[in-house]
């Protein structure tokens, strides 16, 4: 019999902030294709798979959403944001 969890498990996401190192820095944004916020500008990112690290998620999502290829060595933690009501889809 499969184990079931007594408590709900929150969804974990990785959002990627990509900046240039130019005199006038630029930031990479994507235009969301799905609800919520369809058509709005956002950082590339998405939900973490059960078998991947946060860094692996960031590498995968950046490639899926922009075609940009980076390695885990290119990724560093910028910040953690955990507001419960941050996403209308819930936790």
Where are these regions (language model features)?
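Active-site segment of metal-dependent pyrophosphate-handling enzymes
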Residues: 10-12, 55, 59, 67-91
């Amino acid at each position: 019999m499969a184990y079931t969890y007594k408590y709900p498990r929150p969804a974990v996401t990785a959002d990627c902030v990509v900046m240039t190192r130019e005199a006038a820095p630029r930031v990479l944004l994507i235009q969301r294709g799905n609800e919520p916020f369809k058509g709005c500008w956002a950082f590339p990112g998405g939900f973490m798979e059960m078998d991947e690290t946060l860094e692996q998620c960031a590498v995968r999502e950046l490639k899926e959403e922009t075609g940009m290829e980076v390695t885990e060595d290119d990724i560093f933690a910028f910040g953690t944001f955990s507001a419960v009501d941050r996403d209308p889809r819930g936790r």
